[in-house]
Swiss-Prot record:
Pathway: Cofactor biosynthesis; coenzyme A biosynthesis; CoA from (R)-pantothenate: step 4/5. Belongs to the bacterial CoaD family. This is Phosphopantetheine adenylyltransferase. The gene is coaD. It comes from Helicobacter pylori (strain Shi470). It is found in: Cytoplasm. The lineage of its organism: Bacteria, Pseudomonadati, Campylobacterota, Epsilonproteobacteria, Campylobacterales. SUPFAM superfamilies: Nucleotidylyl transferase (SSF52374). Its main location: cytoplasm. Keywords: ATP-binding, Coenzyme A biosynthesis, Cytoplasm, Magnesium, Nucleotide-binding, Nucleotidyltransferase, Transferase. ATP binds at residues 10-11, 18, 89-91, 99, 124-130.
Amino acid sequence: MQKIGIYPGTFDPVTNGHIDIIHRSSELFEKLIVAVAYSCAKNPMFSLKERLEMIQLATKGFKNVECVAFEGLLANLAKEYHCKVLVRGLRVVSDFEYELQMGYANKSLNHELETLYFMPTLQNAFISSSIVRSIIAHKGDASHLVPKEIHPFISKV
């Protein structure tokens, strides 16, 4: 059976930090599923279709990465793909507190599921989609924080 990991997120928008985690985690799995969450609770700046398209463009150079959109429980998506490992990024202590709870919740729904946490590289430690959205909303230039493939998306906002 193939070693498959899932890296879930809203990716609103995808950042250089996300791509760094995709790059590093894709080296650990035969296949990495990047799962773009519907997430109406977060009131996304970009539609699900746009977010999926952005992540597909930004990851087109990765041979073992597949991007999918999903709605519902991540634990169920993991079962569908026969995945036993979730990939998550941790920038700050508050991320850890949230991710620890989510990891336990996912494990309670799918007992085979483990969560693998990645720390960002130093140059990406401060980058978040929230910061990028804030810069964009205030008409600032966030192009240095996101992959070049998505510059057309952020310039339209």
